[in-house]
């Protein structure tokens, strides 16, 4: 049974791609049609590739892989953080700092500084420092937490990277590829899929779409680590038994109705 049903994908708007003038021709095989100047993603393929991504992530997690969630745009930031934490993994949901992976030793020094400032507050050092210095330290900590808080406890570079919108996260993807780290990603119709190891053709701009796909990747990690289905996965299977659009023709009807 598919990990994500056609009905769930439709309700989340996963089928809506970008305007046709913004497309990447390399995504042609994942596009079903065009309606009112918008490309419609072939959800039958999304179902298939989501299954493959789920299996890939689950198997990696079963082998104790470290998985880094990346999504820095506002539509993705909350889901990336929440689902990474739920799965016991790591995330970057604000600006990607160049060299996060390829210059890991420098990033580790910044993380060490973040931990040092936290210790200073906990052990009472802040109480004996001038207020101005404490204010500067708090400002530094806030900035470090914003960009590095999600990888503060990550012991080493990740084994797998999950990305929302690799078009926006091009630097992150390039660093991963340079280090041989496989990339699983939500890929919209405006993106070059060539650098993605496991592609999930999908709308990567709608909050509901991002939440749906990202939650399933977190479910895959939980299942891989626990060796059993998470509660969310079981609920998804039950939901998948409900009446749903079976054919791509029905999808087009829904799209036409939404765009009317």
UniProtKB/Swiss-Prot annotation:
What are the record keywords, sorted? Ribonucleoprotein, Ribosomal protein
UniProt xrefs under InterPro entries: Ribosomal_uS2, Ribosomal_uS2_bac/mit/plastid, Ribosomal_uS2_CS, Ribosomal_uS2_flav_dom_sf
Note the Pfam families from the entry: Ribosomal_S2
Q: Which domain of life is it from?
A: Bacteria
Q: Name one GO molecular function term.
A: structural constituent of ribosome
Q: What does the record list as GO biological process? A: translation
The terms describing its cellular component in GO are: cytosolic small ribosomal subunit
Q: Which NCBIfam families match?
A: rpsB_bact (TIGR01011)
Q: Which PANTHER family match?
A: 30S RIBOSOMAL PROTEIN S2 PROKARYOTIC AND ORGANELLAR, SMALL RIBOSOMAL SUBUNIT PROTEIN US2M
Q: Which family does it belong to?
A: Belongs to the universal ribosomal protein uS2 family.
Q: What is this protein called?
A: Small ribosomal subunit protein uS2
Its lineage opens with: Bacteria, Bacillati, Bacillota, Bacilli, Lactobacillales
């Amino acid at each position: 049974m598919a990990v994500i049903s056609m009905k769930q994908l439709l309700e989340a708007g996963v089928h809506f791609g970008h305007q046709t003038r913004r497309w990447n021709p390399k995504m042609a095989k994942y596009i079903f049609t065009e309606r009112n100047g918008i490309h419609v993603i072939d959800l039958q393929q999304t179902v298939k590739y989501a299954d493959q991504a789920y299996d890939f992530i689950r198997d990696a997690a079963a082998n104790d892989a470290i998985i880094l969630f990346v999504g820095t745009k506002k539509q993705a930031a909350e889901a990336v953080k929440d689902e990474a934490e739920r799965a016991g993994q790591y995330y970057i949901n604000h600006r990607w700092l160049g060299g996060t992976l390829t210059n890991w030793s420098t990033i580790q020094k910044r993380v060490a500084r973040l931990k040092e400032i936290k210790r200073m507050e906990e052990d009472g050092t802040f109480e004996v420092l001038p207020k101005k210095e404490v204010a500067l330290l708090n400002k530094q900590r806030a900035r470090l937490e914003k960009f590095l808080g999600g990888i503060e406890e990550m012991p080493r570079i990740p084994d797998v990277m999950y990305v929302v919108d690799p078009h926006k996260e091009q630097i992150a993807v390039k660093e991963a590829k340079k280090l041989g780290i496989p990339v699983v990603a939500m890929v919209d119709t405006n993106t070059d899929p060539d650098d993605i190891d496991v592609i999930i053709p999908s709308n990567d701009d709608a909050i509901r779409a991002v939440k749906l796909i990202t939650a399933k990747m977190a479910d895959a990690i939980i299942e891989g680590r626990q060796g059993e289905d998470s509660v969310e996965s079981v609920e998804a299977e039950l939901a998948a038994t409900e009446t749903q659009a079976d054919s791509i023709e029905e999808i087009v009807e829904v799209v036409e109705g939404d765009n009317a």
